[in-house]
Amino acid sequence: MSIIVVRARSDVTVERSIRETMSHLNLTRVNHAVIIPENPQYKGMLQKAKDYITWGNADAELIEKMISERGRLIGDKPVTDADVKSSTSFGTIKDFAKAIASGDATVKDMPELKRVFRLHPPRGPKGWGGLKRTYVIGGALGPRGDDIGALVERMI
């Protein structure tokens, strides 16, 4: 399984250890997203930065859309099927996305692909929905489960 993590808040006046945790996750700016594997080390990092990020389970279609529309290679070039085929054992972006979603591959398996996806702020009348409250009580922060897809769709 893989997890999509999106940074929702700035790190101004934030404790140093939390700022470093977000840096280790490669979330250096607001509206940046990363795809990480699900393991205990990352779970601890997510829990530490829970007041500044939101995360949820990644599915193959969402990962495919993120890579094809917002994924960038070194030099700020868009990702194509030919790039995926030349640098990985997968033939298309769709196959690569399925492998990432199932946990058989990571974004690091394609060395030229930047690990951070630069997204738009959430479009629509709701926006983030409250940056000071958790998702469970109507805000934007913390774990979302499968509902992360709706947020990322509005940000792509």
Where is each model-derived feature located?
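Core subunits and conserved enzymes of cellular information-processing
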Residues: 1-156
